[in-house]
Amino acid sequence: MSDILQTILARKAEEVAQRRAQRPLEELQAAVASAPPVRGFVRALQAAVANGDPAVIAEVKKASPSKGVIRPDFRPADIAVSYEFGGASCLSVLTDVDFFQGADAYLQQAREACTLPVLRKDFVIDAYQVYEARVLGADCILLIVAALDDTQLATLSELALSLGMDVLVEVHDIDELERALQVPAPMIGINNRNLRTFEVSLQTTLDMQQAVPRDRLLVTESGILGLQDVALMRDAGIHAFLVGEAFMRVEEPGEGLRQLFFAA
């Protein structure tokens, strides 16, 4: 398949093999014991929703395959502080190097600069990356259903939960949602961006929301750019958001967050 996701996954498999060669799995597993305590990612989102507020996962993202460099002046620690002041519940930090110009160090810098729980935003395909996420200080990992078979999805989710992390299981269509619901993770992310074409439609979330059980926190991801987008989702009963680009394009990301979600 010659789509963007498959290209990314092929490269990710090579990257994981290279990392294993540099740092054996056993060494990584041993390092988990000295990882910083988890901060409670889902708990932070649920607390915001229970309070009647939007629960915002604010993304720390330098670039993307579809848009190129989004934020040339990229300082993860400053961005994290700005987001915390702006009212974010959690952070999402891109760590994919080749396609998003991310880095593991960006996650560490962002987390050390604030008190918010942090999602490691990457293409997780191997248990090695789950241990790696915990050692880096991640409080949550992303599992993309389109990138995994059912066995991988179950195994990686179970491992992450056993290490104390939360899991955001990401879907784009009903078939993927049915697979995601077999995993006992408390969050379902509906990505409005098709990872095979990178086209975006907010209707994706609206069409699928009724199929998400009430005991799962629904997070809408991608394409939330303006006040009308937020109003559309909140009117539909969706109160958890993952937003990056809209904030990365303004000088003060936290102020962008406040204006989009808390100015009214």
UniProtKB/Swiss-Prot annotation:
Signal peptide: none annotated. It catalyses: 1-(2-carboxyphenylamino)-1-deoxy-D-ribulose 5-phosphate + H(+) = (1S,2R)-1-C-(indol-3-yl)glycerol 3-phosphate + CO2 + H2O. This is Indole-3-glycerol phosphate synthase. Keywords: Amino-acid biosynthesis, Aromatic amino acid biosynthesis, Decarboxylase, Lyase, Tryptophan biosynthesis. Pathway: Amino-acid biosynthesis; L-tryptophan biosynthesis; L-tryptophan from chorismate: step 4/5. GO terms for molecular function: indole-3-glycerol-phosphate synthase activity; phosphoribosylanthranilate isomerase activity. Gene3D superfamilies: Aldolase class I. InterPro entries: Aldolase_TIM, Indole-3-glycerol_P_synth, Indole-3-glycerol_P_synth_dom, Indole-3-GlycerolPSynthase_CS, RibuloseP-bd_barrel. Its EC number is 4.1.1.48. HAMAP family: IGPS_B. One of its GO terms (biological process) is L-tryptophan biosynthetic process. Belongs to the TrpC family. The gene is trpC. It is an enzyme of class 4 (lyase).
